[in-house]
UniProtKB/Swiss-Prot annotation:
InterPro entries: Cyclin (IPR039361), Cyclin-A_N (IPR032447), Cyclin-like_dom (IPR013763), Cyclin-like_sf (IPR036915), Cyclin_A/B-like (IPR046965), Cyclin_C-dom (IPR004367), Cyclin_N (IPR006671), Cyclins_cyclin-box (IPR048258). One of its GO terms (molecular function) is cyclin-dependent protein serine/threonine kinase regulator activity. The keyword Nucleus applies. GO terms for cellular component: cyclin A2-CDK2 complex; cyclin-dependent protein kinase holoenzyme complex; cytoplasm; microtubule organizing center; nucleus. Belongs to the cyclin family. Cyclin AB subfamily. The gene is ccna2. Keywords: Cell cycle, Cell division, Cyclin, Cytoplasm, Mitosis, Nucleus. Its main location: nucleus. The keyword Cell cycle applies. This is Cyclin-A2. Pfam families: Cyclin_C, Cyclin_N, Cyclin_N2. PANTHER family: CYCLINS.
Amino acid sequence: MSDHLLRDEHQENVQPRKLLVPVGGRTVLGVLQENHRGPKALKVSKPALQQTQVLSVNHLGVNDENYGKIPARKAASKQPAFTIHVDEPDCATNKRKAVHKKTVQDENLQQLNSVLGSIGTRKPLHPIQIAMETSFGSPMDVSIVDEEQKVVGCNNVADYAKEIHTYLREMEVKCKPKAGYMQKQPDITGNMRAILVDWLVEVGEEYKLQNETLYLAVNYIDRFLSSMSVLRGKLQLVGTAAMLLASKFEEIYPPEVAEFVYITDDTYTKKQVLKMEHLVLKVLSFDLAAPTILQYLNQYFQIHPVSPKVESLSMFLGELSLVDADPFLRYLPSVVAAAAFVIANCTINERTWSDPLVEYTSYTLETLKPCILDLYQTYLSAASHQQQAVREKYKAPKNHAVSLIIPPESMSTFL
């Protein structure tokens, strides 16, 4: 190896020049004072070199031919301080690795072939004996189903039906509006309230809201008007806020606030609707889970099963009672629901209140008679009523067109 190569390989033994040290170098973690003596440690004094040579001589054996001879100083200076290991070229190493890898792959391939040969030929699977036109139901299926599916509500649990009914009977007293509140309103009348409820029925149909949402909204309106005086210009705002609250409480996907602003023909702003919603919540003390006529009807249908037509007629009569505050605010929702059930059952099946329902509700026909007569008069005058949204709603085939059914001539034969 030439002196030039030795100088290149031994650059770490050459004292660094001052120009190689940067002025503003990177600061080492901590100030290590001992490490600043590095350049001085590279200088080797002559006595130290001679001592190294003597030590190397003393290590020779006695029988060695060079024993006792001191090598020339010039020759010692040419000997390198340590030997340098030169790695083999990368191409040779890579070649050996490639050969070894190929050998391992060949061995693995031979083992795999032997295993597959021992397994033998795979037998085909037996065909499933199912007709190709057979379809499996999917929870994501959104196809139209001709058969009407009955929705089971959370209040229709048979094991807890009695406890639920008892709880609802207690809550309906707490959430009952004042019967004569309209007489204390200085600027609105019962006819204005009827127009508002009729409009809410149309809103519910437009956005395909649940019937329960309508019942809750009317309950919120009546309870709010029982405590607060409202100007006629703000009555629709109260109804809009009540419908918004009921939608949030009952619907899975309630309409946005902007939708309610739109249906008022931009009469009110979004800020006004939200502010009224906040006021309604404060007046109602955040008690939104009010029992409704529809909840009681569903319970009565569980105790005394009837045809879908009787169910639709009962719900039609229940919604008719929402339009006029007088006289139906005098009755509890459970009583109005029972009266609607009796009239519908008498109209279609010519039957009245059954014994299981008497035992379940503790209501007798004699107890229900005043409400039955009031609701029957409303049923008779439904076709000539000024507000027709409920009647139009129940003309639809999905509701069995029960609003077109002619009411019985008299209820006295059934009572």
